């Protein structure tokens, strides 16, 4: 792990960073191949990868390791309990969610941003995963940068914010994610990916349907319970319950768990997913909101397991109806789809995952963006990506 104490570092100076960046870029491509020096800036909420649930940090982990495997020089700014193939710069000793000493989450965040800024001249590109928290810094650095938007974009304050930060290059994780917020400077859509050998294809012979992820109204596990019951199938639920959703769990979900055909397993880790998903006849994904991506869908595909999902958010971009699962509009159609899952080819489903959703595929798409941004930087113009608005990298 490299990096220094923030207490011993001098305050960062933008003109100094600009000069250092120009010198380092002039030297960095002499006698070198196209390998890049990349900073990945992860949220500090969870470790990278997280011990259990945590979609953003998992994607950052997969992307970072894939970039290293492809031969690039990557530094990961994350919590000190992270595990990575890259150089780790510990921005805080451990995941903030697990640190009882942290009462103000902005303190670790501001320290992390300071560390990134002081080392910015070492990199060809900075890739942030902090949503809008990094924008004031990124706009003022002379280093090409981009930010992947991992969360929901329907918050009422965001249009005003992106009226101010309209030049920050951002990447959506699905085209559907952009719908409530068209203002940002979208330079591409890059879908998530998983390591090819992370999950194994299973036989689907367990005689149950699966629900995986988080207990919350927008994920609608209550709908999954009703669908499974109407289809005459057992349902296994592997999910976490956040504090904010405990009342929903207590009043809506817990009373349904007394049924003999529903089993609540709780939160599971990465090593348990192959068995859980691989033995399931199908994954139920009856979402009640515009899901930005839905990582559990491609986890199921990696296990060869079809997905029955509501036609909402990113679902039509991820699933191919009648091939990798069924896209439905309501519970009745979902029940009908359960009766058709035997017609789907689990080998074909896994093959579609290999073709579209591996971590290396995701990394190659991001490398195209890094190269475009750094090329613009080498011409003496700091790219804001406007020429590429709306481009999609979904291949």
For each predicted feature, which ranges?
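Catalytic cores of nucleotide-sugar-dependent glycosyltransferases that transfer UDP/GDP/TDP-activated
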Residues: 15, 21-395
């Amino acid at each position: 792990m490299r990096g220094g104490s923030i207490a011993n570092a001098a305050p960062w100076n933008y003109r100094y960073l600009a000069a250092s960046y120009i010198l380092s870029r002039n030297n960095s491509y002499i006698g070198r191949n196209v390998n890049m020096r990349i900073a990945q800036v992860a949220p500090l909420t969870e470790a990278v990868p997280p011990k259990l649930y945590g979609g953003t940090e998992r994607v950052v982990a997969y992307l970072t390791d894939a970039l290293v495997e492809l031969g690039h020089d990557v530094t990961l700014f994350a919590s000190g309990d992270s595990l990575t193939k890259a150089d780790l710069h510990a921005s805080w000793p451990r995941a903030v969610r697990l640190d009882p000493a942290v009462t103000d989450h902005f303190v670790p965040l501001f320290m992390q941003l300071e560390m990134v800024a002081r080392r910015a001249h070492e990199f060809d590109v900075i890739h942030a995963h902090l949503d809008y928290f990094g924008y004031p810094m990124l706009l003022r650095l002379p280093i090409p940068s981009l930010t992947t938007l991992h969360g929901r974009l329907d918050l009422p304050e965001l249009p005003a914010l992106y009226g101010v930060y309209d030049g920050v290059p951002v990447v959506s994780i699905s085209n559907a994610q952009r719908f409530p917020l068209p203002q940002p400077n979208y330079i591409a859509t890059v879908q998530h990916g998983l390591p090819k050998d992370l999950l194994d294809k299973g036989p689907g012979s367990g005689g149950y349907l699966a629900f995986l992820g988080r207990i919350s109204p927008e994920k609608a596990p209550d709908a999954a319970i009703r669908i499974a019951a109407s289809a005459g199938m057992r349902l296994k639920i592997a999910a976490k319950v956040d504090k904010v959703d405990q009342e929903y769990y207590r009043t809506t979900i817990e009373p349904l768990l007394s049924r003999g055909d529903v089993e609540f397993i709780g939160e599971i880790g990465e090593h348990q997913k192959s068995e859980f998903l691989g033995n399931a006849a199908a994954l139920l994904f009856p979402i009640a909101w515009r899901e930005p991506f839905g990582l559990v869908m491609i986890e199921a595909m990696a296990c060869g397991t079809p997905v029955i999902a509501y036609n909402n958010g990113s679902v039509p971009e991820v699933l191919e109806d009648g091939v990798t699962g069924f896209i439905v509009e309501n519970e009745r159609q979902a029940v009908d789809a359960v009766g058709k899952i035997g017609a789907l080819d689990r080998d074909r489903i896994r093959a579609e995952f290999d073709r579209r959703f591996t971590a290396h595929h995701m990394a190659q798409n991001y490398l195209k963006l890094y190269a475009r941004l750094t090329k613009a930087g080498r011409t003496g113009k700091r790219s804001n990506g406007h020429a590429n608005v709306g481009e999609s990298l979904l291949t």
